[in-house]
Regions:
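Phosphoinositide-dependent membrane-docking surfaces
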Residues: 12-22, 88-89
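Phosphoinositide-binding peripheral membrane targeting modules
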Residues: 2-15
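Short, mixed-charge low-complexity intrinsically disordered segments
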Residues: 127-139
């Protein structure tokens, strides 16, 4: 199993979002001109570098697909993804997670494993119900 380093994560996000992420030190924050995305790096437990992403929903759907591709290529290091329909998606990355746990807003277990199709199915389900909120956790 190969884990993505922070520099690799930054490059992948730049490719996905089409933005140059200059700051990557702990505590720094990147905000784009249109407030479409906020990227903030911090220490998860004083040893794990974690990046937090908050962005609008349509951009979040692109991130979901990117995460599925990362899973299929064994870049498995996502800690959790929170998707709020038509509002925001929160994506948490860290360098020490692998298995995927999917719960709905009420904490009901939907899926556990590391299958990329699970994320794509969640993506499809989000289109059906504007009130759906999912939390996806790895680790």
């Amino acid at each position: 199993m190969r884990y993505m380093k922070y520099g690799e994560l930054r490059i992948n996000l730049e490719n996905l979002l089409g933005v140059y992420i200059e700051r990557e030190e702990v505590g720094d924050k990147y905000v784009d001109d249109n407030s479409e995305i906020v990227i903030q790096s911090f220490n998860f437990d004083n040893s794990i570098s974690t990046t937090k992403i908050l962005c609008k929903f349509e951009l979040g759907k692109k991130i979901i697909n990117k995460l599925a591709n990362l899973l299929s290529s064994e870049y498995i290091n996502i800690q959790s993804v929170m998707i709020i329909k038509k509002e925001f998606i929160k994506v948490w990355y860290s360098n020490s997670k692998k298995d995927c746990l999917v719960e709905d807003f009420n904490g009901e277990l939907i899926y556990i494993g590391d299958d990329r199709d699970a994320l794509l199915n969640i993506d499809k389900e989000l289109d059906k119900d504007e009130q759906n909120v999912f939390t996806v956790k790895w680790g």
